[in-house]
């Protein structure tokens, strides 16, 4: 399995960039704006609602991206990635617009509070509170409460999986894209892709240390360790050249063994951050087309 030409070109551009794990939190947050250079033009959507939703300790900025059509809309609660530490809704704007248009779902994106200032369980508690808010206020935002699911990429995939564990009886589906699901750096993907693939094993150690803080590893922090019986149908997407690849693969296998309907999709030639690189990597747009079909079959 080799890196495809598009991913190789990205890696060449990233060569020589400062190691994230040697950065301060401020430096890492500033560096994440570099993703914008790899993104395509933002698509128009029918409308975007900007709002704040109450979290347990703070009001949380949120947006709802609406596709064309008449509601009430099925909805995706989207929890963004970047290690529980960095990124925001502005950096994900292009991806969120495309998600709404491709799937025909309203996309409810939440800017949860970040570690290390707000370590576990704060980002998860924020995510759960925002999800509960959408169920409670679905009618007022033109959403069908019977068709709400959760989605996230990377650290957001971790949060989405944990939200599904806590709200398994309410959610219609879960979509986990390149999810980081356990604190186990001995897997083959962590060893084989320790360096040189846009996300390093040491960077993941840095992210996990900030997220966990002084908390012990629990099933909600590391959903791969949780019981998964009765969870909603899942779509798990992984990248072939990604330290966290095996997390998603193992979780999909665990879901299947528990009788949860699951589709595992491996984009074998690409790298971890493809959701934020749609201007130079094809995989996110391919994923959106497949998600549209999968969601239509539920």
Regions found by a protein language model. Give the residues of each.
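Short amphipathic alpha-helix adjacent to the substrate-entry channel of hydrolases
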Residues: 90-110
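Gly/Ser-rich "nucleophile elbow"/oxyanion-hole loop immediately N-terminal to the catalytic nucleophile
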Residues: 135-150
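Short beta-strand/loop motif that positions the catalytic acidic residue
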Residues: 236-238
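Short beta-strand element of the alpha/beta-hydrolase
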Residues: 72-82
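Hydrolase active-site cap/lid region
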Residues: 165-215
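Gly/Ala-rich beta-loop-alpha elbow adjacent to hydrolase catalytic centers
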Residues: 152, 156, 160
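A glycine/proline-hinged amphipathic helix-loop "lid/cap" segment
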Residues: 1-64, 296
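Catalytic active-site module of serine/aspartate enzymes centered on a nucleophile-bearing elbow/loop
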Residues: 279-298
């Amino acid at each position: 399995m080799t890196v495809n030409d598009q991913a190789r070109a990205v890696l060449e551009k990233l060569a020589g960039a400062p190691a994230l794990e040697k950065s301060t939190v401020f430096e890492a947050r500033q560096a994440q704006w570099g993703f914008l250079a790899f993104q395509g033009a933002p698509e128009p959507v029918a409308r975007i609602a900007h709002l704040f939703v109450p979290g347990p300790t703070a009001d949380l900025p949120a947006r709802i991206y609406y596709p064309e059509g008449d509601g009430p809309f099925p909805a995706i609660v989207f929890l963004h990635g970047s290690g529980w530490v960095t990124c925001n809704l502005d950096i994900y704007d292009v991806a969120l617009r495309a998600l709404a248009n491709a799937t025909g779902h309203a996309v409810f994106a939440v800017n949860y509070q970040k570690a290390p200032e707000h370590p576990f369980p704060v980002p998860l508690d924020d995510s759960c509170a925002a999800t509960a808010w959408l169920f409670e206020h679905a009618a007022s935002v033109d959403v069908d409460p019977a068709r709400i699911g959760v989605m996230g990429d990377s650290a957001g995939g971790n949060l989405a999986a944990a939200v599904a564990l806590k709200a398994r009886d309410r959610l219609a589906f879960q979509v986990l894209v390149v999810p980081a699901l356990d604190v186990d750096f001995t897997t083959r993907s962590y060893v084989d892709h320790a360096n040189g693939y846009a996300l390093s094993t040491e960077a993941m150690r840095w992210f996990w240390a900030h997220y966990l803080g002084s908390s012990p590893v629990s099933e909600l922090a590391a959903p791969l360790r949780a019981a998964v019986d009765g969870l909603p149908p899942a779509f798990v997407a992984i990248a072939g050249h990604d330290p966290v690849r095996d997390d998603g693969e193992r979780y999909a296998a665990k879901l299947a063994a528990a009788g949860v309907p699951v589709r595992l999709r491996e984009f074998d030639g690409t790298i971890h951050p493809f959701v934020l690189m749609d201007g130079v990597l094809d995989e996110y747009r391919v994923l959106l087309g497949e998600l549209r079909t999968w969601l239509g079959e539920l």
